[in-house]
Amino acid sequence: MKPNYFVAYLTANDTPFFHIDYFNWMNMFKHHPGVDHIHLYVAISMVQQFSFFQRKLIEAMMQATAKCKWITLEAVILKPNQGRDFSSLRECLIAMKGLAVDNDFILVRNRSSRGPFKSQWYKKYINQFQSHDNTGLVGSTINLVDHNERGLKANVSHVQSYSFLSTWKHLSALLDNFPGMMASTHLEAVIDGEIELSQRILRSGAHISSLQKPEMILDLDSQNDPVQSQYPAVVAFQDIPIVHRKREPRGLQFWIKRLGYFKLLTFLVNRKLKVKFMDLNRR
């Protein structure tokens, strides 16, 4: 059976204008993903009270999905900030229940990511996922060391969570006690969320890998082999569809494109798409 394709986009309302999210969304709507159709779920952690103005901004930004042939907006989820991106992902997965099945793909990205800047962006993650048997998680990049404030020397390899792809089979298995779902600090989000997510996948018997080092395939045992640190980064950052914000090129074109944010004014006036908000703060 042909799989479905999902995107879970995770952000927060600690900045008033969602300008980074706007450019990320417009890039997804502009560049063809290389798959037939994507179901988009957006989760917004409420760092502060969600204002009427912010609701209207999100509604305006999502108007572009009405014209995008390959993305359907399924829901915008408003949720408490506890658990940060990891509780956000969990809520997106809960919302996908009933539609997603085991072999469906789920691409997860947060506000620290940038892109995509080229077409075939979703397909590239799938290609890496399918290039080796028993894959459970594929990221843009991968890290072999622990957070320096904890400093463990083993069992800490992890896909960096600003952008990664997995399947419903692997992610739904984590729902009952999702990694990082109770995190309240950045350190807890890294250790209990980002690192633990990969470690749970590895403990299930599956493998993790990345687009940057496609031949470095880690399992529970090989993650601690010193030879892994010798794998070169054979894929340049400009060839990775979704990169960390620190890797985004900032030349003249970067600043010219920033002016495109003002196109949002037309979406504010011409709203045709009804956005469905799921406000979990009212439960």
Region locations from a protein language model:
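ER/Golgi luminal nucleotide-sugar-dependent glycosyltransferases, focusing on the catalytic module
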Residues: M1-R283
